[in-house]
Amino acid sequence: MNFKYIVAVSFLIASAYARSEENDEQSLSQRDILEEESLREIRGIGAKILGGVKTALKGALKELASTYVNGKRTAEDHEVMKRLEAVMRDLDSLDYPEEAAERETRGFNQEEIANLFTKKEKRILGPVIGTIGNVLGGLLKNLG
């Protein structure tokens, strides 16, 4: 009788331990899934913000371009117009990152691709903002 009791208790302890190990593995995988979902949400929010900024910049640049097109242009104005056109092309290239990704990132893993796009956006948006500042400064100087 004592032997049967010892075997039964040992079996219960072993099954409880196995269930706790299984629950630990499930909670880890659920935690990983939740972390991945939160990262996707953060990326989605960032993409929406960046999209809004790009749309606003495009609108401002189109307005500036139409102002330059309708008036007489000096050589300096012509140079500024060329810069604006280049900035517009750069902003348009940000709208189709999938095509750029296929050409530029073959063989990279997902993290390297994300870092590449972040660097590319910084590389493009930095000069864009500088150019817009210069254009607005030039307009204010010409108007004043």
UniProtKB/Swiss-Prot annotation:
Keywords: Amidation, Amphibian defense peptide, Antibiotic, Antimicrobial, Cleavage on pair of basic residues, Cytolysis, Fungicide, Hemolysis, Secreted, Signal
Organism (species): Bombina maxima (Giant fire-bellied toad)
Domain of life the protein comes from: Eukaryota
Ranges in a coiled coil: none
Protein name as it appears in the record: Maximins 7/H6
Family: Belongs to the bombinin family.
Signal sequence annotation: 1-18
Residue positions, PTM Leucine amide: 143
Any one GO BP annotation for this protein: killing of cells of another organism
GO cellular component: extracellular region
